Amino acid sequence: MDRYDYIIIGAGSAGCVLANRLSEDADKTVLLLEAGGKDGSLMIKMPAGVGGLIGKKGPQNWGFWTEPEPNLEGRRLWWPRGKGWGGSSSINGMVYIRGHARDYDQWRQMGLGGWGYADVLPYFKRSESLEGGGDAWHGAEGPLKVSKASSPNPIYSATIEAGGQAGYPLTKDFNGFQQEGFGPYQLTIHDGQRWSAARGYLHPVLARPNLTCLTGVRTTRILIEDGRATGVEIYDEKTKAKRVIQANAEVLLSAGAVQSPHILQLSGIGDPDELDAHGIKVVHALKGVGANLQDHVDVCMSWECPKPITAYSLRKGLVKTLGIGLAYMLFGKGLGRQQFLESGAFLRSRPDLDRPDLQIHTVLAIMQDHGKVQVAKDGFTFHVCQLRPESRGRVGLKSADPLDDPAIFANYLAAEEDRRALREGVRMMRKVAAQSALAPYITAEFAPGKDVQTDAEIDAWIRRSAETIYHPVGTCRMGTSGDRMAVVDAECRVQGIAGLRVVDASVMPTLVGGNTNAPTIMIAEKISDVIRGKAALPADDAPVYGDGLKAA
């Protein structure tokens, strides 16, 4: 069959949601296209497999590199992106974070009706099944299973206690009443298994007769006739053949913040200057395609630990490593059930800010270069991440060849405020590490090291060592009708093209304060109702800490 009502490009966090919800209508045919394969790998299922997935190019990882970064000593940065069913939800760190309520109220204030916190909270709740049951902020019956941090490792509780000793708030639920403070993470893990968007949304509906899923196919362009998307051209990686598939109703582009703009550009939709430079005929001029790229930049501060309780000792040697895999594969038991990242914090680098601008992830290992460098010492890391970048980058073309990687210009730390916030984050986490609660677990600061003290020294270390923490958004951003740089409207329809929507992290107008998997799933849940002509879920005014409300 070469004609479907809906064609979804990309089986990632958003595409899996759309495939599930749109195929609920038995009279509609749905085609889900995925360039990668299925998600049957043990490394995907096993939470401890995350390190082996995120650090190298392979069947589950596109493994992109940025162009040289001018503010990071001209380095090209590693950009892992998920490939295959589940997309990046199949290779990420499994941290379930929605962002701050004011992130979404900011979208509404930008003129994007229906995107305030009260509007999106019902869709977060609909998607979620929180271990132990729901409450005012959490769902209990959704496809996405979410658990609470459960590791008994004392470093997690010690970092939270040290945060309190340093004078920072504590919180029990980053996704509830109060985001700010130190506390435990919630995780997309269920019964010791990764719970990706594919696991939650796609697998349960694979038997539906109106849903067709193709893997190993690259979408080379979207077909436009008389101002309407009529279908797609795909390339089969096995047969090396191209074919055209028609869409009766809509084409839904859910290829992510890197590849959604790239596919639009290959289709002749984008900035005419960019298209002309690569000999691509302009089908529809839309200057904002690929612009407005935002991402969370991150540095890894690490401390050596005198106790053999971190990933190095727990996995040291071939026998232990094989034992972890075998115990998990045969019995579903042991360290394979953990992703070694269960506590963290959301903090403000200045007291005048209305919400946190720093996020901390505590990892039970000395992290260097996305875990590619194995440090033969026990230790732990504070990932220090700047949440609200003022810097903007872009995604462009390297060539007109649809099989070429896109060109990624992240443009990290171009703004002084971004540099100031990250520098302050380094100082704040040193203050936390100096507290008595962490004293039994620290012998020395591994990185940046005691010789890095002045602003200039910290800035130089950041330029040498900063990396992505994998949250790119904004390259097909949502906006109002008068916004020349907006790519889609508040219903994710591509401006000026009928029958075409972008539904993924690329539509976020501003980067939310936290990990981006849960917000991407929420966006797809919300837009699936729009596509189906269903009324939006009623707004939900759950209380959130702010002016006039007392902190927890």
Q: What is each stretch, according to the model?
A:
Residues 1-552:
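N-terminal redox-cofactor-binding region of secreted/periplasmic oxidoreductases
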